[in-house]
């Protein structure tokens, strides 16, 4: 009987709009806003729904990163390409995140959203930010580097530290590659284990609307729409800056490399809506690994760039850090000359690299930065504590788009991008992840095993 590749079947399947994930998440967010506004106590009580969904996602992030990176590296013929990919990725991250920091600094100086507030620092309640300041003091260059090395292998996975898991995965992948055919059974096991993990993600993502509903209901219920008005100028300024950064800066990078930022945003629309609902770019990480490989980037590039980008390429967080720091100075009438601002920029070039893609990490890094600079009042963090949750959504969305662009660009730089596949996927707008395709199992390094090969076709 004739067979039809599963890829073709998945790509041509169309579903009613009410069954699509992005439609369900949009409806859930709207309902969450209404519940939080009209029934704030009920909204606050729904917080566990959002927290539970994020915990479910974080539960599988470490094993997925491990499988993706190990199989990608172990299956490569030339180990030099791994170092080349990592080097180009870090170069891209440093250049683009520096541009993001500079744009935030320029915009906040031009617009001056904090001017005229005349806040007396002594009147601010610093008790609410004590935990953030304490966490921020632990942020240092040496501490950050040492923290990348896990105390134990189990500890890295148990704590869910992305960089620790990534480091161990890279070492494990190199070691497995050196074993050659002797290590093939281990690689085959990782292949199959990865397939199981991605199927777990598919099941978890069915709960995305519930998670987005709970998180949004809590945010509006706890802080209220009225809390947006007082510091609305900073929020509007920040949101507009993020949009301009994506359209102009990332858009220019995309255009220079032969694809459209608007088509890319459309392609990852479901992931963006999940991030919008949860305020955490980490919630979309597993799906981004699938989407970026479908887009034509080799799995070895995807496995290195995406996880690393969650600490080194947070463009939205970079914009937020410079804008928030200078806003606090403006609101408290703290003088900042060009020397102070250059010092702030240099400190942020280092401290911003320690921000993971989870909710609230940007605020901790901001506390660390203010403590390190010394010139700015740390108590001023209390000014933006109430609206940080609302700004975290723009941060997370910008971070996600930035890492998607980085993956495609780095893949093209190292010659690991299928440009025909890229253009066809972007032109089609991408297919919904209805089921995990065999080729989405990023563990397949050399090609399907005989057992896998049977499942790559579907009888019609």
From Swiss-Prot:
GO biological process, one term: L-aspartate transmembrane transport
Pfam families linked to this entry: SDF
Membrane topology type: Multi-pass membrane protein
UniProt similarity note: Belongs to the dicarboxylate/amino acid:cation symporter (DAACS) (TC 2.A.23) family.
GO cellular component: plasma membrane
Function of the protein: Responsible for the transport of dicarboxylates such as succinate, fumarate, and malate from the periplasm across the membrane.
Protein name: C4-dicarboxylate transport protein
Subcellular location: Cell inner membrane
Keyword Transmembrane in annotation: yes
Molecular-function annotations in GO: fumarate transmembrane transporter activity; malate:proton symporter activity; succinate transmembrane transporter activity
Keyword set includes Transport: yes
Disordered as annotated region, ranges: 438-460
Major subcellular site: membrane
Keywords, comma-separated and alphabetical: Cell inner membrane, Cell membrane, Membrane, Symport, Transmembrane, Transmembrane helix, Transport
Domain of life from the UniProt record: Bacteria
Membrane-spanning residues: 21-38, 53-75, 88-110, 153-175, 196-218, 231-253, 301-323, 363-385
């Amino acid at each position: 009987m004739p067979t039809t590749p599963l890829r073709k079947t998945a790509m041509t399947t169309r579903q009613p709009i009410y069954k699509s994930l992005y439609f369900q998440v949009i409806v859930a967010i709207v309902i969450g806003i209404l519940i939080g506004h009209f029934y704030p106590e009920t909204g606050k009580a729904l917080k566990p729904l959002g927290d539970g969904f994020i915990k479910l996602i974080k539960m599988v992030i470490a094993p997925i990163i491990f499988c993706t990176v190990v199989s990608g590296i172990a299956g490569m013929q030339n180990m030099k390409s791994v170092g080349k990919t990592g080097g180009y990725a870090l170069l891209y991250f440093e250049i683009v995140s520096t541009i993001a920091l500079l744009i935030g600094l320029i915009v906040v100086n031009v617009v001056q959203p904090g001017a005229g507030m005349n806040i007396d620092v002594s009147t601010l309640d610093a008790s609410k930010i004590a935990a953030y300041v304490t966490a921020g003091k632990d942020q240092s260059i040496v501490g950050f580097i040492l923290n990348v090395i896990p105390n134990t292998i189990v500890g890295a996975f148990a704590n869910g530290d992305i960089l620790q898991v990534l480091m161990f995965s890279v070492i494990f992948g190199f070691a497995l590659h050196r074993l050659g055919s002797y290590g093939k059974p281990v690689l085959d096991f990782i292949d199959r284990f990865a397939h199981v993990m991605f199927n777990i993600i598919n099941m978890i993502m069915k709960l995305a609307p519930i998670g987005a509903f709970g998180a949004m209901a809590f945010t509006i219920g706890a802080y209220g729409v009225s809390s947006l008005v007082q510091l609305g100028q900073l929020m509007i300024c920040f949101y507009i800056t993020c949009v301009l950064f994506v359209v102009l800066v990332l858009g220019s990078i995309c255009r220079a490399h032969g694809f459209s930022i608007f088509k890319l945003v459309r392609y990852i629309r479901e992931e963006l809506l999940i991030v919008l609902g949860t305020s955490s770019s980490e919630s979309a990480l597993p799906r981004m690994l699938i989407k970026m490989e479908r887009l034509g980037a080799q799995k070895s590039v995807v496995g290195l760039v995406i996880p690393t980008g969650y600490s080194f390429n947070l463009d939205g967080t970079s914009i937020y850090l410079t804008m928030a720091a200078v806003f606090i100075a403006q609101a408290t009438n703290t003088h900042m000359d060009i020397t102070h601002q250059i010092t702030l920029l240099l400190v942020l070039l280092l401290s911003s690299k320690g921000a993971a893609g989870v909710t609230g990490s940007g605020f901790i890094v901001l506390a660390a930065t203010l403590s390190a600079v010394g010139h700015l009042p740390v108590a001023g963090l209390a000014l933006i504590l109430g609206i940080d949750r609302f700004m975290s959504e723009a941060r997370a969305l910008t971070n996600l788009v930035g890492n998607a662009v980085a993956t495609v660009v780095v893949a093209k730089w190292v010659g690991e991008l299928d440009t025909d596949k890229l253009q066809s996927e972007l032109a089609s707008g991408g297919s919904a992840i209805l089921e995990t395709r065999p080729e989405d199992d990023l563990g397949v390094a050399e090609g399907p095993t005989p057992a896998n090969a049977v499942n790559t076709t579907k009888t019609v």
